[in-house]
Amino acid sequence: MISEENFQQHTPMMQQYLKLKAENPDILLFYRMGDFYELFYDDAKKAAALLDISLTKRGQSAGQPIPMAGMPYHAVEGYLAKLVQLGESVAICEQIGDPTTSKGPVERQIVRIVTPGTVSDEALLPERQDNLIAAVYQEKEKFGLATLDMTSGRFQLCEPADKETLRAELQRIAPVELLYCEEFNEMAAIEHCKGLRRRPIWEFELSTAITLLNRQFGTKDLRAFGVEKSPLGLSAAGCLLQYAKETQRTALPHIQSISLIQNQDCIQLDAATRRNLELTQNLAGGTENTLASVLDKCVTPMGSRLLKRWIHQPVRDVEKLKQRQQSIAEILNFDLVDELQPYLQLVGDMERILARVALRSARPRDLTRLRTALEQIPALRAIVQQKTPPFLTALFSQIADFSEQCDLLQRALIETPPLLIRDGGVIAEGYNAELDEWRMLSDGATQYLENLEKRERESTGIDTLKIGFNAVHGYYIQISQGQAHKAPIHYVRRQTLKNAERYIIPELKEYEDKVLKSKGAALALEKQLYDELFDLLLPHLGSLQLASLALSELDVLVNLAERADTLNYVMPTFCDEVSVKIKNGRHPVVEQVLKDPFIANPVELNHNRHLLVITGPNMGGKSTYMRQTALITLLAYIGSFVPADSARIGPIDRIFTRIGASDDLASGRSTFMVEMTEMANILHQATAQSLVLIDEIGRGTSTYDGLSLAWACAEWLSKKIRSLTLFATHYFELTALPEQLEGIANIHLDALEHNNTIAFMHAVQNGAASKSYGLAVAALAGVPQSVIKLAKQKLTQLEKNSSYSAEQQIQALREANHNQGELFFEQETDALREAIEKLDPDDLSPKQALAYLYQLKKMVG
């Protein structure tokens, strides 16, 4: 903190800088000085380290040298992009005063703040990925979460029921910035997020949030958006909107509504499931060999982003899914893929261009790309109208007629404008008569100067005479030193060079003033006309946004049709029974990376067969089989066709996976602890409509502990939850479960062993695996034969000396299951036991005793 005394010791310019810096102490300040952005003090040191730019010193202020770093204004976007990628925020300070009239430092002010979550510049954004900012609020054990996509205006809120649901939502949306209240006390749920920003409690005040939101949407209340009964979500949304306004320093007209995300509307995927299924990110953190990498061949960036949102948020509305399916079928039946995609490709990223139009930050080439996008709509509409597919026709009903706006941009802009309006040459000839006049005057200078040069050369007889221009001295007549003595008396010397003299004459000076005025006037008028284009487009922003959303959806549907045709996918059907029946299903990703043909496999889960115990060798394909079942189910619930011969799928509310685990070193949790935490979440959250994948539960502890836990988990899922479950295990003892419990069946993935080698068949068969292939897999992995031989000897010895054979262990578990059936009844009898213990028969009348007996009978069903 700089004291008043120290502040006064600084130069006026540095005082101005320090005042602006004090407004934004926690972020970098880019301070405009002429053609450069400069950073000072700690900002300079930090920027020099992050951007690999030179750290210098700028004289002294208050008796101390000033650390300084900077970059040219025309190169700032590249530096901003790097800083944003590193999670930094930057305040942009511009000169708004006129240097020629300013007394003291030129007036400056912060015009915008660039943060990772509020950027809209094309160069700063990942093209095919949403760039979201979120805010989270907490009251007791409940949460409110709001998200905003500044590049589209999409504004949503939800109220996660608990911290696990909050963690899953944050994993889904992956915000690049997260605002949280200073009183937030569940940091473990958000500590994995990028760009954490602590905000004061008053920014989450509910009444302020409602007022702010109503003012933004021009409404009296929020009932039309269906969010009025979500106070925690609204508190988060209010903070988020206020932050967006603070950083942008302008109106946000593209944020026109807010919607509520209802958990019951979507299939819930927890963080572990998203990770294990490798939807958009693989286990190594990359994007290769993910579901999105196979499925996403969209021709527009906005379509690609929409598809990823569908993948991460499968919907349960079967009617909506059937509409998507029928649209895909129409595209295939009418052979529309090749017809529609070339036009869609030219639509480009209309969604983000419109956001920049709303923020009035769109550059000339943004507007020409918008023009190109609007030019494609009639052609796309004509193709659809010619074939009249009902679902696609309904989709096109959301796209208005933009011929007027398209004509405006065609008349106003040249074909290929320069990057920035400051360079001029953006507005087309014929659009504005006054601009054409100014341009004619300035553009006519070349011919006039050629004529003047010819005339002066002839009148003076000086053959080296020529007319030129530079930014410092303006127009001049140049004569070589050898002929300078011939210069007429009315030539006024302007500059002496080593080999020439430069002069000015009244006529040339007068023309210079006229030309410079015309160029300045033309540029000023061009900027004014450019700004007026925003005024003419903004009244149509809402309908343009609806059109961009419809075109995004069309791109996704055409893409899914192309994928279905290319990859041999089929349309799944939906049914009312909780079930999954897939004939010859394939893993959508693995089949694309395998050199050999993929072995397709069936799966059938229903009320009478709701848990499959899967055995077989490691590397035999158990994990692939389970994942493909989940991915096929997920694909069905985004409306896509699926990799199978047929698929019939019933209602699913959640997908859980407990597949693979490793130590969580950062949190100090072992593999076993990670495994048990994920398993506990499944046992608490799963329902009879959940699809549950369990792979090798019980590792990382003693054999008997692991076996007991695996058996108990399988039994609980089968008896108490009755979810649709695939339960892969290396405990052969669990294959006895079907004999003990209804609804459980054994399946296995087979392998063939011959002469110490093993061949994996990858084909699912009914029944349990005949044996374990652990030693054969170890040999395949390259374990020395001497070690394998020793292991076989030890295995024989252990089996011989074991106090329990495998059959005896299974029998013991059967008896334990029979004798301890009450364990699963304990929770239900706790209340009954407590009621009886509190009962005092001597205090009851006969009528009260009879009533109490009926109550106890009701408790036991």
UniProtKB/Swiss-Prot annotation:
Signal peptide per UniProt: none
One GO biological process term: mismatch repair
Residues noted as binding ATP in the record, renumbered to the chain: 616-623
Gene3D superfamilies: 1.10.1420.10, 6.10.140.430, DNA repair protein MutS, domain I, MutS, connector domain, P-loop containing nucleotide triphosphate hydrolases
Any one cellular-component term (Gene Ontology): cytosol
InterPro entries referenced in this protein's UniProt entry, alphabetically: DNA_mismatch_repair_MutS, DNA_mismatch_repair_MutS-lik_N, DNA_mismatch_repair_MutS/MSH, DNA_mismatch_repair_MutS_C, DNA_mismatch_repair_MutS_clamp, DNA_mismatch_repair_MutS_core, DNA_mismatch_repair_MutS_N, DNA_mismatch_repair_MutS_sf
Pfam family, one: MutS_II
Keywords on record: ATP-binding, DNA damage, DNA repair, DNA-binding, Nucleotide-binding
Gene Ontology MF annotations: ATP binding; ATP-dependent DNA damage sensor activity; damaged DNA binding; mismatched DNA binding
Similarity annotation: Belongs to the DNA mismatch repair MutS family.
Protein role: This protein is involved in the repair of mismatches in DNA. It is possible that it carries out the mismatch recognition step. This protein has a weak ATPase activity.
UniProt-listed PANTHER family: DNA MISMATCH REPAIR PROTEIN MSH1, MITOCHONDRIAL, DNA MISMATCH REPAIR PROTEIN MUTS FAMILY MEMBER
Name the UniProt record assigns to this protein: DNA mismatch repair protein MutS
Source organism of this protein record: Haemophilus influenzae (strain ATCC 51907 / DSM 11121 / KW20 / Rd)
